[in-house]
Structures are given as C-alpha cells and as structure tokens.
C-alpha cells in the first residue's frame, strides 16, 4: 500500500509483522538504527499546513491546542510536555515529532528497556519519550484542527472532500454494487 513511496521519494519501507500484537513502540524499535535528526510521522494524519522544515533547531512533539480525553500530556507555559493525571484531558496528540540525534540516542535506550518487558509491547512509542512526569522533548503547539488523525473514509471526506484518496477503483466497485454514488458511501 505504501510501495509507491519507494519510487517517488526513495524511502525504505520496513514492515513490523508483529504490529497487531506489539503496537508502534516495537515498530519504531525496528528502525532505531536510522533515527537521527528524524521526523516521526504516523500514516493516518491529515495536516492543513506542511509540518516539515528544512532546518529544525530542537526536538519537539506536536500537540494540538484542542483538549482530548485520550491526551496523556499538556503543554505548560514553559513549552514542556507534562503528564496529566488519569481522568483529566490533555492536549490532542497527533503523533508527529522531530528528534535531534542526541534525543534519538536517549529514545533508543528507553525503547530497548521498554521492549524487554512484555507488558510494554502494547505501548505507543511516546512512552519512551517520558522521563518521569514529563517528556524529554518540548511541545510544538498547533491550532485545533490543523493536524488531525483520520481513522475512517467519512472523516477524510468531512475534512478534505477534494482529496485524491477519496477516488479509487474500489470505491467505484462498492458504489456500483450498492447502486449508490461514491459520495453516498
């Protein structure tokens, strides 16, 4: 599904066959030798503005101004990302980050420690960013709605009805079988 990225951008795809049982902490561990001055970007994110820069001065983890019950952190006045108590909302965490080499070295060590413990296999990779109650990287705060997680076709259609991802042969077949237009799916 992502093979087009190889020819178009020269990326190297690495597959985690254990993803169904080990989540993305173990996926990131599979590419740890490539981590240095690196963006980490989930594949289910929609960005209203390009989040990348040719020069990043510091490591950061992107959070939205939007409150989210699933958010584990909040950005404080110093730009630090601090853990929120259970039951409280934090900032929405779309999952995009940039890590300088030194922070990647720390991340590698923490991922190794976490992945040795089978209880950690279901963790998200962000667990390795924590040092006690705060993350080792600062916040990159973006306005609510600028970066969102897309989990369904309907969410993508609501956010970006002109997206080329909404047009596919599969959708045309589904529409034909159901006797509906693709906009009705």
Model-flagged regions — what are they?
Residues 92-183:
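Conserved alpha/beta core of the MobA/IspD/sugar-nucleotide pyrophosphorylase nucleotidyltransferase superfamily
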Residues 37-46:
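Short beta-strand-to-loop acidic/aromatic patch adjacent to the donor-nucleotide binding site
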Residues 26-34, 77, 154-158:
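Short, surface-exposed amphipathic charged segments that create phosphate/polyanion-binding patches used
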Residues 2-3, 24, 28, 48-50, ...:
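Short, well-ordered alpha-helical microsegments
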Residues 48-120:
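Conserved core of the sugar-phosphate nucleotidyltransferase
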Residues 1-38, 117-119, 180:
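Conserved N-terminal catalytic core of the sugar/cofactor nucleotidyltransferase
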Residues 19-23, 68-70, 145-148:
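A short acidic, often aromatic-flanked loop/helix-cap motif at beta-alpha or helix-coil junctions
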């Amino acid at each position: 599904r992502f093979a087009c990225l190889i020819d178009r951008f020269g990326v190297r795809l690495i597959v985690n066959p254990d993803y169904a049982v080990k989540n993305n902490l173990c996926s990131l561990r599979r590419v740890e030798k490539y981590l240095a001055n690196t963006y980490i970007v989930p594949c289910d994110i929609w960005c209203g503005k390009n989040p990348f820069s040719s020069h990043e001065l510091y490591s950061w983890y992107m959070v939205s101004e939007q409150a989210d019950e699933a958010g584990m952190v909040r950005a404080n006045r110093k730009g630090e990302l601090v853990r929120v108590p259970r039951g409280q909302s934090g900032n929405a965490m779309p999952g995009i980050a940039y890590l300088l080499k030194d922070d990647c070295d720390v991340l590698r060590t923490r991922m190794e420690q976490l992945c040795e413990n089978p209880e950690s296999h279901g963790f998200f990779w962000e667990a390795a960013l924590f040092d006690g109650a705060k993350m080792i990287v600062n916040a990159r705060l973006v306005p609510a709605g600028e970066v969102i997680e897309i989990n369904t076709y309907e969410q993508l259609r609501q956010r970006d009805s002109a997206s080329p991802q909404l047009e596919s042969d599969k959708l045309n077949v589904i529409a034909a079988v159901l006797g509906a237009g693709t906009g009705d799916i």
